[in-house]
Amino acid sequence: MRILGIDPGLARVGYGVIDTSNGQQQMLDCGIIRTNPGIDDGVRMVEIASDLRQLIRRWKPQLAAVEKFFFYRSSTTISVVQARGVIIMTLARFRVPMVEFPPMQIKLALAGSGHAEKDEVLDAVMRELNLDQPPRPDDAADALAIALTGWFQR
């Protein structure tokens, strides 16, 4: 199964693509969709949708796993929620089934504790995907953790 993990954001959307054929997890791609903070939010969301479309067309995921936004008070809360809506809409448009996980569930699935530290989750990602180097940037590593959670929780 090919799974696209997504760590939503407006400035940076982390993505990670894994393949789980033959009972092993393998990283195929990871990175970020970056938008320019100096332009209108609507244009930034169009960029996110466009880049996500390209990823979907390239990798043809059978499942998308998206981090569920947990509410907190911040000046970026609304824009992140809006960007997440664009991501969900784009996945639906391409009929990619989607599952959502809150951060604590991702930490629990990978590190065994919902209160695990970021480095514990990163170590688990590296171990599960047999990586010698940590994926960069952090948003991409987070997206791989989300994709792995999608696989583990299926």
From Swiss-Prot:
Gene Ontology molecular function: crossover junction DNA endonuclease activity; DNA binding; magnesium ion binding
Residues at the active site: D7, E67, D139
Residues reported in the UniProt entry to bind Mg(2+) 1: D7, D139
Catalytic activities: Endonucleolytic cleavage at a junction such as a reciprocal single-stranded crossover between two homologous DNA duplexes (Holliday junction)
Classification via InterPro entries: RNaseH-like_sf, RNaseH_sf, X-over_junc_endoDNase_Mg_BS, X-over_junc_endoDNase_RuvC
Binding-site residues, Mg(2+) 2: E67
E.C. no: 3.1.21.10
Compartments, as annotated in UniProt: Cytoplasm
Primary location: cytoplasm
Cofactor, free-text remark: Binds 2 Mg(2+) ion per subunit.
GO cellular component, one term: Holliday junction resolvase complex
Broad EC category: hydrolase
Keywords: Cytoplasm, DNA damage, DNA recombination, DNA repair, DNA-binding, Endonuclease, Hydrolase, Magnesium, Metal-binding, Nuclease
Cofactor(s) the protein requires to work: Mg(2+)
GO BP annotations, alphabetical order: DNA recombination; DNA repair
Function: The RuvA-RuvB-RuvC complex processes Holliday junction (HJ) DNA during genetic recombination and DNA repair. Endonuclease that resolves HJ intermediates. Cleaves cruciform DNA by making single-stranded nicks across the HJ at symmetrical positions within the homologous arms, yielding a 5'-phosphate and a 3'-hydroxyl group; requires a central core of homology in the junction. The consensus cleavage sequence is 5'-(A/T)TT(C/G)-3'. Cleavage occurs on the 3'-side of the TT dinucleotide at the point of strand exchange.
Family, similarity comment: Belongs to the RuvC family.
Assembly notes: Homodimer which binds Holliday junction (HJ) DNA. The HJ becomes 2-fold symmetrical on binding to RuvC with unstacked arms; it has a different conformation from HJ DNA in complex with RuvA. In the full resolvosome a probable DNA-RuvA(4)-RuvB(12)-RuvC(2) complex forms which resolves the HJ.
Protein's name according to its UniProt entry: Crossover junction endodeoxyribonuclease RuvC
Species of provenance: Prochlorococcus marinus (strain MIT 9303)
